Amino acid sequence: MYISELGELWHRARVEPSIVHLDSAAASRSSNKVIEAVTAHLWRESERGGYVAQEQSSELLARTRRDIAALVGHTADELAFRESALAALRALLTYWNMPVSATVWVAPNEYGPNLDQFERRGYAVHTMPSTDGYGRVDTDALQNMLQFEQPDFIHVCHIGSHSGIVQPVAKIVELAHDAGVPVVVDAAQALGQVNCVTGADVVYGTSRKWVAGPRGVGFLATRSDSLRPVEIESSEAFIAGRIGLGVAVQELQSFGVEKIHRELAAIGKYTRERLFGVGSWELMEPVGEQSAIATLAPPPGWGPSDVVAARDRLRSIGILVTCAESWRAPLYTEQSVLRISPHLDLRRGHLDQLATELRGMGY
């Protein structure tokens, strides 16, 4: 039995999986229509030539641009395509006219590779205070800090790579703008999972996670009135993937984007309730967190290699999850966790099977 009322429709739109896929935060399963759209464009490229096929698909590409921009509260002319979320961030930091030794404030859940990009450019990185033990930004403390100091920009992962905590991005943007500070949002894990219209100056993300588009497609939306206009469209591109992303977004729209958000939050809650206290594994989010990602810290005495071994054990019996190591959130933790991230086609039996295996690994 599916957890979500959308589960059967989501499942029927895809090839039958050979595994229990609980890894949408890494890469969701694309639908048959997405795969067909990608394949059809590749055939057009072979038949007519790549650039001719791209030109003849201009209306499809324009719709994709409009639809993605709308999901993040931007206009089509503010959106550029790149190869991935990280490629989008690199392009932004390359073309933005930042001062030498710029200061950036980040949330505790900041993605490690993003921090590497800041470090390589000599930025001074400061962590915004957290309101709880989960790494959620304390917006009251942030408001107070902004009265006395303003960074060059704030960068926040709407949802991180290491846990399912949803940052209060809209409030962060409101406070930052009141202080004249621009905000950049990494929406890689958020797009398709939660509302990403926050008023941020810059939003970037990827196709392959909760939107269930193809790999190899990312985007960057930069407000026309932000720090500096950024012209960073990637011209040598996976055009078929962009068309596939457009189909994936249209499918989300057909289901109802807000309804998907609600259903995924309910799936996350059910997942946490089912796995709470299983085999000495510790749940790392509040049960009611409004995301579909659940992370489990290992039993006492386990090290990072043990969590990797647990992931490999699950994979060997056909259950796909991620070992989220500490490099994903180095400001927050030194601990590796198991990350469980089901999509709409989650069945109760999937979690029962996972719980049984986890119980056998614990105490």
Residue ranges and their predicted role:
Residues 45-87, 264:
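Conserved N-terminal alpha-helix of the aminotransferase class I/II PLP-enzyme fold
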Residues 265, 269, 278-318, 324:
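Conserved PLP-binding catalytic core of the aspartate aminotransferase-like
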Residues 198-231, 238-240:
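Active-site PLP attachment segment
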Residues 133-187, 192:
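Active-site phosphate-binding strand-loop segment of PLP-dependent enzymes
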Residues 63-67, 241, 245-284:
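Conserved PLP-dependent catalytic core of the aminotransferase class-I/II
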Residues 77-78, 95-116, 124-126, 130-131, ...:
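Conserved PLP-anchoring active-site segment centered on the Schiff-base-forming lysine
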Residues 18-65:
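A glycine-/small-polar-enriched, mobile loop at the entrance of the PLP active site in fold-type I
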Residues 2-3, 316-317, 327-363:
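PLP-dependent enzyme catalytic core of the Aspartate aminotransferase-like
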